[in-house]
């Protein structure tokens, strides 16, 4: 029987958080018991330090809060929770939301447009999410809204703006930029060949380096079998930065399942 560390204190709490149920999403089933225990410890601290704010009638219960916290903490499992110090609130809409977008074109004209967003990450402010896309982040499909927005926060720790280069040693920056831009070019070539909808990697990754880092961070954790063989050099850089190897984790979990299946009597 697994002895979950957070269950030891359950008798002391009238409303124990449902961590074991929260861990049951496909994305987290490949984690070892030790990794799950460590992730829950981080997620507990996350919920103590951050404020989850439901908007427009969205109902936030304990299970939803736990799963949101677990996904926020997965990218920083080995980095530490201090890497998420750049915000204090998470705003959660029930569905994708409309925002006013303003930009300046090449000749200096300012344009305003209302656009639909799945999420936002403000450099000196909250992270904004929506529950429909959070739910779609539970599986291992290559899409993960929370990891995408967390990646932007990790990116901006390196300076004033998101550049696609997280906080790594200076001697690693040139190699990181080279491999990231090579990946962007490769994705763009595929888009030109088969179209955005048929591309094997989200076309948003080709839009700029910051989005490439965020999108590939989604694939790193939720579809490593697509990322690793296609961009092996960049994959190793991601492994070094995040201090995790989700592909090795996936293979180990599959091997364990196969062994268990062959020993069923």
From Swiss-Prot:
One GO MF term attached to the UniProt entry: zinc ion binding
Documented EC number(s): 3.4.11.-
GO CC annotations on file: cytosol
UniProt KW keywords: Aminopeptidase, Cytoplasm, Hydrolase, Metal-binding, Metalloprotease, Protease, Zinc
Signal peptide residues on this chain, from the entry's feature table: none
Domain of life: Bacteria
GO BP field: proteolysis
Places the protein is found: Cytoplasm
Cofactor: Zn(2+)
SUPFAM superfamilies recorded: Metalloproteases ('zincins'), catalytic domain
Cofactor-binding details, from the entry: Binds 1 zinc ion per subunit.
Summary of subunit composition and partner proteins: Interacts with Mlc.
Chain's role: Involved in the modulation of the activity of the glucose-phosphotransferase system (glucose-PTS). Interacts with the transcriptional repressor Mlc, preventing its interaction with DNA and leading to the modulation of expression of genes regulated by Mlc, including ptsG, which encodes the PTS system glucose-specific EIICB component.
Family per record: Belongs to the MtfA family.
Name recorded for this polypeptide: Mlc titration factor A
Organism in which the protein naturally occurs: Shigella flexneri
């Amino acid at each position: 029987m697994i002895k979950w560390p957070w269950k030891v204190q359950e008798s002391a709490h009238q409303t124990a958080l449902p961590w074991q149920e929260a861990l049951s999403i496909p994305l987290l089933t490949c984690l070892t018991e030790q990794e799950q225990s460590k992730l829950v410890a981080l997620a507990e601290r996350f919920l103590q330090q951050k404020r989850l704010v439901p908007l427009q009638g969205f109902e936030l219960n304990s299970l939803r809060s736990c799963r949101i916290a677990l996904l926020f903490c997965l990218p920083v499992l080995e980095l530490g929770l201090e890497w998420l110090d750049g915000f204090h609130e998470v705003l959660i809409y029930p569905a994708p939301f409309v925002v006013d977008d303003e930009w300046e074109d090449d000749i200096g004209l300012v344009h305003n447009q209302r656009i639909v967003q799945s999420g936002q990450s403000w450099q000196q402010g909250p992270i904004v999410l929506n529950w429909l896309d959070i739910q779609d982040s539970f599986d291992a499909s290559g899409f993960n809204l929370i990891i995408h927005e967390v990646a932007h926060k990790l990116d901006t720790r390196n300076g004033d703006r998101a550049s696609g280069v997280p906080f790594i040693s200076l001697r690693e920056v040139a190699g990181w930029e080279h491999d990231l831009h090579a990946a962007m070019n490769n994705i763009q070539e595929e888009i030109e060949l088969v179209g955005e909808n048929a591309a094997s990697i989200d076309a948003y990754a080709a839009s700029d380096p910051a989005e490439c880092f965020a999108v590939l961070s989604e694939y790193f954790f939720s579809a490593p079998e697509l990322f690793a063989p296609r961009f092996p050099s960049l994959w190793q850089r991601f492994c070094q930065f995040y201090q995790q190897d989700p592909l090795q984790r996936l293979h180990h979990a599959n091997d364990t399942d196969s062994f268990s299946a062959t020993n069923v009597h």
